[in-house]
Amino acid sequence: MNMTPLNGSNKIVVVGGGAAGMMAAGMAAQAGAHVTLLEQNGRPGKKLLITGKGRCNVTNDCAWQDVLLNVPTNPRFLYSALAGFSPADARAFFEQYGCALKAERGNRVFPVSDRSQSVLDALVRFLHENHVQLLPRRVTELAAAGGRVTGVKTESGPIPADCVILATGVLSYPATGSAGDGYRLAAALGHTIVEPVGSLVPLVEKGHDCARMQGLALKNIAVRLVNAKGKTVYEDFGELLFTHFGLSGPVILSASAHMARGEDGYTVRIDLKPALDEKTLDARILRDFSAAQNRDFENSLSALLPRSMIPVVIARSGIDPLQKVNSITKQQRRALLETIKCFSVPIACKAPVEDAIVTSGGVKVSEVNAKTMESKRVQGLYFAGELLDVDAYTGGFNLQIAWATGRLAGLSAAAKEFSSPEDAT
């Protein structure tokens, strides 16, 4: 049978100028393909600029196998992609294109500049060096015939292509242009979409205590996520933030990924003093009380707790805020200690998917070839990044997935060979 090896002359359209899309476009072009990158915002990498609080957690300084341990959804699907482009490979790539990197706590890798713009600059340099054409276009439809993709339709007209790589933004952070178009485009060609929900997302409290402490950030605290059966499904140590609706911050975002779909009754339990066991904490409280014997209880905790937290802890302890410290009983002191060591926040639900850093759900991975990222339903159609039903915890793992799947999709599309038309007759 005659084959038409396009040998790098494939015309490839990449839809979506985020992390995965830029990597896919650059890699395909570097392999010799003619690549057009379509980004409806006109400016690629908009969401990338706000990741990691504007610093961009590029990857994690770990073995690629350890990345899989931080992927709760479909980790086996990523085996080939990560084996081919590890965190070490990602670091080398960005260093090569002028973005110096450093590793911090938890092996999180950031640009030395502490600016996400440095990461974006490296990617843009990569695109320019490999002559990727960037166009500000919104794709309205994928064109296909005979089980093979033939291009895309945009609001400005059709663009023919041998291969199309879908790497669109998902539903999170709509202000950056993420509208979930990729789900619609993939579904129109027969792909199953696993319902998107927030994965790394803030949590909404049932009561109002968090709102009373809005803006308070706590560092070096221990967190446990407990389900309705009382089982601890996640625990970690780090930083959280009280908001007007509930809880946010790194440990909370990671905890949210462990909340099963459709399950209610979760509680976040916070140890406000994890470095102190109960005996040591009790001794600390006694020392503070000794120094404030004649004060009202509400005026005795400033050395132990943040100011905005004191009224909430007092209310939960059941101790009268105006009770004199020298009259507080051992049982009351015990109630205070238990409140500090297990500050519970019943969770009503996750915040809306629009508030999520990462979305769980997307194109069903059993319909995608894990070794190439090509659709099993439509020849010449590829997927990369968050559009796929894979997600990971915080720590640079989600961007590592974007780099790895984008690279694999780009190289696979550039190397794609098609049967010549006459063989079909």
Which residues make up each language-model segment?
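Glycine-rich active-site loop/strand segments that organize a redox cofactor
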Residues: R55-A103
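An anion/pyrophosphate-binding glycine-rich loop and adjacent beta-alpha core
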Residues: G42-P44, L49-I50, V58, W64-Q65, ...
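A conserved short coil-to-beta-strand element within the FAD-binding core of flavoproteins
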Residues: L135-R148
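Glycine-rich FAD pyrophosphate-binding loop
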Residues: A29-K53
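N-terminal Rossmann-like FAD-binding beta1-loop-alpha1 element of flavoenzymes
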Residues: N10-L37, A409, A413-A414
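A glycine-rich dinucleotide-binding beta-alpha-beta segment and adjacent secondary-structure elements
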Residues: L135-R138, P311-D391
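Short hydrophobic core segments
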Residues: V13-V15, L38, V139, I159-A175, ...
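Core beta-strand elements of the Rossmann-like FAD/NAD(P) dinucleotide-binding domain
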Residues: G8-N10, T154-C163, E235-D236
